[in-house]
Amino acid sequence: MKRISILGVTGSIGTQTLDVLRFHKEDFELVGITANRNIELTLDIIKEFSPKYVAINHEESYKKLVDLVKSEGLKCEVIYGMEGLVKVATLDEIDIVVTSVVGMIGLKPTVEAIRKGKDIALANKETLVVAGELVMREAKENGVKILPVDSEHSAIFQSLQGNAHNKIDKILLTASGGPFRGFTIEDLKSVTPERALKHPKWNMGQKISIDSSTLMNKGLEVIEAHWLFDCSYKDIEVVVHPQSIIHSMVQYTDGAVIAQLGVPDMKLPIQYALNYPNREGNISEKLDLFKIRELTFEKPDLDTFKCLKLAYEAGEKGKLMPTILNGANEVCVELFLNKKITYLQIPEIIEECMNTFDYNKEVTLDNVINLDKEVRQYIYEKYN
């Protein structure tokens, strides 16, 4: 039996991970969880799965949960803040950590978990975006497996099994194209948060839905793929595939292309990461190719969806430039959702930050965290 912690248990990936655990009750024990504000759902999860440790990162919610746990006689330790996240990620009794929190908050607990020798089922792509050099070095030094949960990176990981890494010609990273595929810049001027949140294929949280609409999500995945699979940026090609059936592909030097196909359901890559290297039965729908009938492919429009282009630029410049890109994007998405900036201002402000801040510093935990704070403060003061 594998013992696990889930960081971000009430989010989209977290709740789907719970679905996998319900289906494989004999294979996993949930030891620790973290959440932010959704205390009602957190309480339900505590009652169902009986985790020993629960970390809450929102102060009022933490106090509320402490009272509820006590009044209902539940046996778990409730911990507050970043200290709590790190504790849940580094528990002696766990084997693997599912990092499904959104944004920079996942960095410190993930790094500390790696230093404790815990395998990582990685759904928090920002961790590799801002500190890929540090994370992969720590993973290697501590003998830790980084198992991708993003459907695209899971597909690449699966397509690499049994093949020599030095025989890769390029990685083909698929993208649905988002809700605005085929739009012009003029069309995007009137985009509202409500429209941007309606993804055609995937049911996701707010932040990743906006990122998918701007193609920043794909840009972050390009940087993530660079670190996970040790490929140069020129060998990572984004392919728009509206059906979202092929989750990504690897082309080898002999011309062969190996792909992983499946219905668009995050439970598939979650289960693969948790069960690796084994394959087990799944609650997800099976792929029926006769229903699909056709698969189509397009090149991404980098002029209209500039975020993807900016991500490539940030990745190629390296050092702390991806930290600037990521921090600026997180704040811009928040301001857009709150209707403080327009949709087209998102790439404009990100590019402004990339041209404003010094990125040529060593990638350390402190440098990443400090620069991220500076970038966020700059945008809040100027645009909020």
From Swiss-Prot:
**What are its cofactors?**
Mg(2+); Mn(2+)
Highest taxon, organism lineage: Bacteria
Role summary: Catalyzes the NADPH-dependent rearrangement and reduction of 1-deoxy-D-xylulose-5-phosphate (DXP) to 2-C-methyl-D-erythritol 4-phosphate (MEP).
The record's catalysed reaction(s) read: 2-C-methyl-D-erythritol 4-phosphate + NADP(+) = 1-deoxy-D-xylulose 5-phosphate + NADPH + H(+)
Name residues in a coiled coil.
none
What InterPro entries does the record point to?
Answer: DXP_reductoisomerase, DXP_reductoisomerase_C, DXP_reductoisomerase_N, DXPR_C, DXPR_C_sf, NAD(P)-bd_dom_sf
Select a single GO molecular function from the record's annotations and give it.
NADPH binding
UniProt-recorded name of the protein = 1-deoxy-D-xylulose 5-phosphate reductoisomerase
